[in-house]
Amino acid sequence: MECENGRVSANGMSGLCVAAPRADPLNWGKATEEMTGSHLDEVKRMVAEYRQPLVKIEGASLRIAQVAAVAAAGEARVELDESARERVKASSDWVMNSMMNGTDSYGVTTGFGATSHRRTKEGGALQRELIRFLNAGAFGTGTDGHVLPAEATRAAMLVRINTLLQGYSGIRFEILEAIAKLLNANVTPCLPLRGTITASGDLVPLSYIAGLVTGRENAVAVAPDGSKVNAAEAFKIAGIQGGFFELQPKEGLAMVNGTAVGSGLASTVLFEANILAILAEVLSAVFCEVMNGKPEYTDHLTHKLKHHPGQIEAAAIMEHILEGSSYMKHAKKLGELDPLMKPKQDRYALRTSPQWLGPQIEVIRAATKSIEREINSVNDNPLIDVSRGKALHGGNFQGTPIGVSMDNTRLAIAAIGKLMFAQFSELVNDFYNNGLPSNLSGGRNPSLDYGFKGAEIAMASYCSELQFLGNPVTNHVQSAEQHNQDVNSLGLISSRKTDEAIDILKLMSSTFLIALCQAVDLRHIEENVKSAVKSCVMTVAKKTLSTNSTGDLHVARFCEKDLLKEIDREAVFAYADDPCSHNYPLMKKLRNVLVERALANGAAEFNADTSVFAKVAQFEEELRATLPGAIEAARAAVENGTAAIPSRITECRSYPLYRFVREELGTKYLTGEKTRSPGEELNKVLVAINEGKHIDPLLECLKEWNGEPLPIC
């Protein structure tokens, strides 16, 4: 049996024809190719694109990072590729000729939507009416939260220009140039926050861009200085000559009947989401460092056997951060000292972080590609096919890729936030954090220092709101426009909710990063204090235990090694505020070493010169006189930068993030003795993240990664 243009399937079943290898008419091949390479490399590319000073568009190659750059109203300028002018003009001319020839076309000679049975020969008037009736948004006072953020509006303007440049929409090139001039002059039309279902495109908000271009009296824009201006002043600031545009047939519909507002905001959201996903991976590795975790969880074989690329990459990135980490070397020594000091396996928030983050990265990456396709698509109706001389009536305005991608992205963001909260909760809990103080309290008196307790409560609040936002938008569709738009994507609504989720994840990331830096500093104090305690105890032991009253060597001198073991086993912050207190474990355990030696001393205990027990009081008295001062001196040395032992963080690949938070942003180690609050410090990090200042130190942590896991050996 043979198949035309194909081959019989391998099992030989009749009637089943498998297509032969050929071109990629369904676009699956291209979609697959777009996912090759590492996620980190893709993020690096995005960052490089974001920083380019010129965004040149021709309709088919716009990137989400470029949208984010223009939306931010920074240095990026927009330029229209002249190669698009001819095809844009051709479609515009076709519409005019079509109407003059009496061709009946939707939105040119007909009414709109469910009322498309109506007819008119007044093409220009029809477009003006379209813009008028779509100006149905509400702004309130303009300061009460009913206005779409300027960044989202700028993103929408850029995306709409790009999609119209492909020449299938019937609009003049000059209108697109005018919108680009508004962008470059940082003049932003005021669009309503709500009012679109992103089904026949984002009709209502886009109509306000059209209203400004056509000089409607109710059109308002925000000038570069933040003041509100009318259409005439907006044109003057932007340097647009020739007055307002009188819309020709189809031009109003071309401007409003597209998905640019939803996909524009989605682009800015995904630029942030991709970077925050990388940050979550690195913070998970730093969490392992300060928790004295076991890096075995990143071993490549574990993840290779699971097959999921997001998981494999997340593990490889964490593995890279932890490879050679001074904290991991120290944690290994602690484990060898006493394997029973902590559980055999770390808890899920650490040990399964690659398995948890991997699928979220895959979702965010897939959503990024989907939105990138959308912002380069022709998404209005009808489409003008000049080559075949016809108007195609379809539904590319349906923004389902936006609604679905944003719902999925928001769920992924919620999952990342949940992991971050679980890690934070372990970090501040002294039952789980392997020796750090409760609430990461950094002061000398834990009764007057509750550290990050308030921050943990805030994190619970953030996480709860984020989990609520994780619920889908797209299952709340209502039939609209006289049941013509009976299914609709809710793309912009979903994008807005995802934008909210991004803001919350930034709050959580800022809080967690400050807490991790606090933990790094506490580990530094811990190591210096422990060293000081060992030195002090050894000095006291040599003074009080080495000899008897006659100067002969005493059997108690053999306690020194066991005393050091007990110091190593005991958490510094379990006793540091009052080391000689009998309510704390250190003195009890040191005494117990001497008591055990005394019990093993047999009959020699009955001789005053050989009794170990007789040495206990002298040993403890000397410790009370010297140990508190030794601990205070060690803490003070860390605080004034003269610590005997340097911080291990400087020997770690995660150091650039710590340096960024502590040195560049000037955040401080928090204690109850000082007036500075956690909120004041984490707000510095939040502002920096909002400004994108965290990107370079984050990528610096990974600059040596070659894109592969460590070899299995």
UniProtKB/Swiss-Prot annotation:
Gene3D superfamilies in the record: Fumarase/aspartase (Central domain), Fumarase/aspartase (N-terminal domain), Phenylalanine ammonia-lyase 1, domain 3
Pathway: Phenylpropanoid metabolism; trans-cinnamate biosynthesis; trans-cinnamate from L-phenylalanine: step 1/1
Coiled-coil boundaries: none
Keywords: Cytoplasm, Lyase, Phenylalanine catabolism, Phenylpropanoid metabolism
Catalytic reaction annotation: L-phenylalanine = (E)-cinnamate + NH4(+)
InterPro entries: Aromatic_Lyase, Fumarase/histidase_N, L-Aspartase-like, Phe/His_NH3-lyase_AS, Phe_NH3-lyase, Phe_NH3-lyase_shielding_dom_sf
N-terminal signal peptide: none
Main location: cytoplasm
EC number(s) reported in the record: 4.3.1.24
Any one GO molecular function term: ammonia-lyase activity
Post-translational modification: Contains an active site 4-methylidene-imidazol-5-one (MIO), which is formed autocatalytically by cyclization and dehydration of residues Ala-Ser-Gly.
Binding site residues for (E)-cinnamate: N257, Q345, R351, N381, K453, E481, N484
Domain of life: Eukaryota
Keyword Cell inner membrane part of the UniProt annotation: no
Cellular component terms per the entry's GO annotation: cytoplasm
Active site: Y106 (proton donor/acceptor)
Cross-link (5-imidazolinone (Ala-Gly)): A199-G201
GO biological process: cinnamic acid biosynthetic process; L-phenylalanine catabolic process
Functional summary from the UniProt entry: This is a key enzyme of plant metabolism catalyzing the first reaction in the biosynthesis from L-phenylalanine of a wide variety of natural products based on the phenylpropane skeleton.
Record text on subunit structure and interactions: Homotetramer.
Family membership noted in the UniProt record: Belongs to the PAL/histidase family.
Protein name stated in the entry: Phenylalanine ammonia-lyase
Gene of this entry: ZB8
